Amino acid sequence: MKRLSWDIELRCSQCGAPISLEETDRLLICSYCHVKLYLWTPSQFCYCLPALKASSENLIFIPYWRFKGVAYSVIPFEVRHRILDATRLAYSHRVLPVTLGIRPQALKMRFASGEIQGTFIKPQMSLQEAVMRIQNQFEELEGVLLSRPPFHREFIGELGSLIFFPVFIRNRAVVDGILGKVIGPEKDLVIDEAPSGMPDHWQIKPLSTLCPNCGNTLQGGRESLLLFCTVCHVAWNPSSGSLVASKFKVIPGKGDSPVYLPFWMMRVAVKGIELKSYADLARAANLPKMIQSEWEGQEVYFWVPAFRVHPSLFLRLSKQMTLFQPVEEMEAVLPNALLYPVTLSEESATASLKIHLAHLLTKKRDYFPKLDEIIIESAETTLVFIPFISTGSELVHPRLGIGLQRQTLSL
């Protein structure tokens, strides 16, 4: 899925050459020395807007939350989605506007680091609180239009980061560090609890992309959450700050399979609704099939795309895969073909389970009012790569009867 992104500017840690990234990029490749590193942080990524007065002024950095993702709402009687892409002031004193507007799009940001001199104000609200406030604004309007609040809502985040806006004090006034314009009196800026520099847990750490087992260069896309060794057939997860082996499976392709798409296969535990077998799933979704006796003992797996796509396609693919329940033989051997990058985390997939359940239920008037009582959790999760073949402008899986436009993916 093509998306607008903001530009980040940094320098290669090996040769010092300038590198330009998009904000969702995690894999860094220097075009000069060809070093390949994975960018990691113990909390969230933090950026600074460029200050024109940095050379002569003592800068103070004001925090904004930047969040991008999809807000899903279960309403009478459908699942709706809204793409959220916003910034929100994370400072309780209103010396600056509530949002950053278009400035991050017009300027190249830098990663916040210890090299940047100044006083950094800590965010005074969490990312979750900032997202909730935006959602509440939309849903207050929806509540008026619908005469009742949604049955359930979920925010599936694509990214969440801190952006610091530079200001400084001059003649007892707070001055915009980018434009040099006065934006308020000095008394509106309270920095008593601000750290004097950039805290360590806000800074990035570059990780090696060499396989810990064999030393081979790991493979992955610019936004990959997992990296793969095609020599020793291991998936490596860098989310903890070191490369940790992660389990995966592959459904082998037959014939020409140009691309393998990743899905999270999740064995679920459900309370509040009868959903212990594939037969229960078939009845809940009112599948136009005769219920087979062996289905009563077949476990239920939810299949969630492990890559970001448009919300409507995200729901459709999950519903189709979950209702079909692929049962092909799987192996832990990486194919000699394109692996589409894993860009949706297991945590986000787990958070989306109730939304997918609501989407596939047929008797929505019966089940939607009870959604708060329904608990659905992942008991076991495995990453599975499924082969798709190219037919003109589409990628299809003939046996599953599932297809999607190539233009919806970054291929």
Regions found by a protein language model. Give the residues of each.
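Long C-terminal interaction/binding lobes of large macromolecular proteins
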Residues: 2-14, 18-21, 25-411
